[in-house]
Amino acid sequence: MRQSIFFMPTLKETPADAVAKSHQVMLRGGYIRQVTAGVYSYLPLGYKVLRKTEKIIEEEMANAGVVEMIMPHMLPASMWEESGRLPKYGPEMFRLKDRHGREMLLGPTHEETFTDVVAKSLKSYKQMPLQLYQIQTKFRDENRPRFGLLRGREFVMLDGYSFAASQEQLDKQFDDEKAAYLKIFKRTGVEVRPVIADSGTMGGKNSIEFQAPAAVGEDTIATNASGTYAANLEMAVSVDTFKQEPEELKAMEKVATPGCDSIDKLAEFLQVPATRIVKSVLYIVDEKKKVLVLIRADKEVNEVKLTHLLDCDSLRVAETSDLEELTGAGKGGVGPVNADWADEIVADKTVKGLYNVVVGAGESDAQFINANLDRDFRADRFADLRVANEGEPDPVDHEPLKFTTSIEVGHIFKLGTYYTETMGAKFLDQNGKSQPVIMGSYGIGVTRLLSAVVEQHATENGVAWPKEIAPFGIHIIQMKMKDEIQSKLAEDLEAKFAKYDVLYDDRNERPGVKFNDADLVGAPIRITVGRDAADGIVEVKRPGDDQAQKLAVADLEDFIANELD
């Protein structure tokens, strides 16, 4: 490809609103252009990277026995009503009505459609296991699109779905998809860590995220040094090392605590450590159930874990007005003693083994001291409900947890019968008995993956693309376009190495302009044809090299084969 006819509108300055390195590089290099907030055009350079990435996905999916197809973008809202997911998505869902007033939506994901079209077509166990996927544009009405392709309102995604007649089949499909995804990420050159994750609105109980460490990441992952534990912070578990020595139980006593509207103020006022205070947090669950959560005051409630425990669609911390109406106390005075108004009291495991603690007295500006579990207040059940802290021991090898910001580039789920039972997708098993199809769901954010690659492979002046998804494998730069010897050599090299996808800079531009643009193209090999062309010598440079090296043209073939084959 001749650069003189290749559409690559580069920018000299970084746009002020581009914060993420990947966003800066893709705008400056002419990979993408914003059409409106969260919506981008993929210019030739960006589209080449996108298509090469999709090709890798297609190859690895075929190797794993996963078959490609395509579903529509526009979906009837009735399918999502049938599955029960429509109200869970809220304002992020793009919704519209056709001329007949029928509710439609633009698909952010396609579990319902695959269940309706595919799972309902599977009548016998003999038709399974089955695995399908599509690469398609998705839509999500993000409140705050940002970071370029990392959080957009329109994006390209691989979404796959598996259908099984048994849990054993699903387990194998899940493992096969995980292995295929790891191969995809390796070939695209992105470092990922599979981590324990929350399934969120997708449903199901078991899921793994693929997280790419990056400074601009919106997620936090918790890992140990030996690599035996990794989890999204939302699901991370740590070992609580605090242990209170047993004490003789004292008589519970109410004390006034004026102005103590924080744990720090309360601890200072009562001259006790936060580990001797039990916080009481009231949650309104599914807008009807009142659940009081107890946790040691030096810890914070993990609402994702709480959602899993309560198996609810929504929860929120009670407003001050709710607290006053239910308990007669303000925020700091709510407590578990005589809390008969609570539908359920659940406690974090940190509450076990505490003696003579401070709890809210059920009225404003007052606390009970020397309160004790079972004697003075109850907990209906215990669970790990706390946010893990960095440095705490992991639950596997008891090594200190390290927190890293990261980008979620993939997510796989064991959905089970979450959709098929609701939507009536059943088959006959070996005994002729009707059973719901067992499903899995698998996704890679393809355009987000491109941003993650740039975040990890950015250079001072551009990007060093991994060889399999680089827009061009070789970038030939001719110094003087009027030099016939240079032109002849550059054209010969372009033809000889055409299979590596060559970009030949034949523009009549200054060397500085050409080299700056070459940094943004980020080809694995840059060949400069200059003053030594008459002697059969060129300069070659890889993105990681400090300096270009001179190389005889006769040695180029072996050098390139060693780098790119």
UniProtKB/Swiss-Prot annotation:
Reaction(s) the record says it catalyses: tRNA(Pro) + L-proline + ATP = L-prolyl-tRNA(Pro) + AMP + diphosphate
TM region positions: none
One function term, GO molecular function aspect: ATP binding
Enzyme class: ligase
Role: Catalyzes the attachment of proline to tRNA(Pro) in a two-step reaction: proline is first activated by ATP to form Pro-AMP and then transferred to the acceptor end of tRNA(Pro). As ProRS can inadvertently accommodate and process non-cognate amino acids such as alanine and cysteine, to avoid such errors it has two additional distinct editing activities against alanine. One activity is designated as 'pretransfer' editing and involves the tRNA(Pro)-independent hydrolysis of activated Ala-AMP.
Family classification: Belongs to the class-II aminoacyl-tRNA synthetase family. ProS type 1 subfamily.
Protein name: Proline--tRNA ligase
